[in-house]
């Protein structure tokens, strides 16, 4: 059991936040602990494109990481190309998708498989449900005393990237809240 937290909602339509979001996921889903820069970068571009596409194009109730995963696994490469080609030229998802698209066919296939493997926890309906909407206010600790408990397994690292996302974004949100609302920041 867990309160729900839509990690994708923290992107708030900002490209820089999308980059941070993607970076945390890629760095915390390497099975060996040390990734290959080429593949990591390619997967980052594809994930950033999917995140920005969902964040900017979907209705609010469908803006979540599970929807980005569904795009990855349910659309063919041709269908993805059509989706991204239909975006306005200035759409922030176009540039990272364009970088992904410039690679060879075999590389693109490897990137899709690699990213799908990293995000395979979203095959689980419970994980999709927990990350589909917000019940947690990351700014609340700045407004009133409260505690959040983030329990992770000491034997299985499968879900560690979600706790890494949570901690990264809670620090960002609290610092921004303090800068805007507290005397002296």
Task: Cite the ranges covered by each PLM segment.
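P-loop NTPase motor domains
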Residues: 1-185
């Amino acid at each position: 059991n867990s309160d729900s937290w839509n990690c994708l909602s923290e992107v708030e339509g900002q490209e820089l936040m999308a980059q941070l979001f993607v970076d945390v996921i890629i760095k915390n889903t390497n099975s060996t602990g040390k990734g290959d820069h080429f593949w990591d970068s390619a997967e980052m571009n594809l994930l950033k494109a999917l995140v920005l596409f969902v964040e900017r194009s979907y209705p609010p109730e469908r803006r979540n990481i599970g929807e980005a995963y569904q795009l990855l696994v349910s659309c063919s490469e041709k269908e993805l190309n059509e989706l991204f080609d239909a975006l306005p030229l200035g759409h922030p998802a176009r540039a990272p998708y364009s970088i992904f698209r410039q690679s060879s066919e075999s590389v693109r296939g490897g990137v899709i498989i690699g990213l799908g493997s990293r995000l395979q926890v979203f095959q689980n309906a419970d994980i999709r449900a927990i990350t589909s909407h917000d019940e947690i206010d990351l700014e609340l600790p700045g407004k009133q005393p409260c505690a959040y408990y983030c329990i992770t397994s000491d034997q299985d690292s499968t879900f560690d990237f979600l706790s890494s996302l949570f901690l990264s974004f809670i620090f960002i949100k609290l610092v921004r809240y303090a800068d805007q609302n507290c005397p002296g920041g």
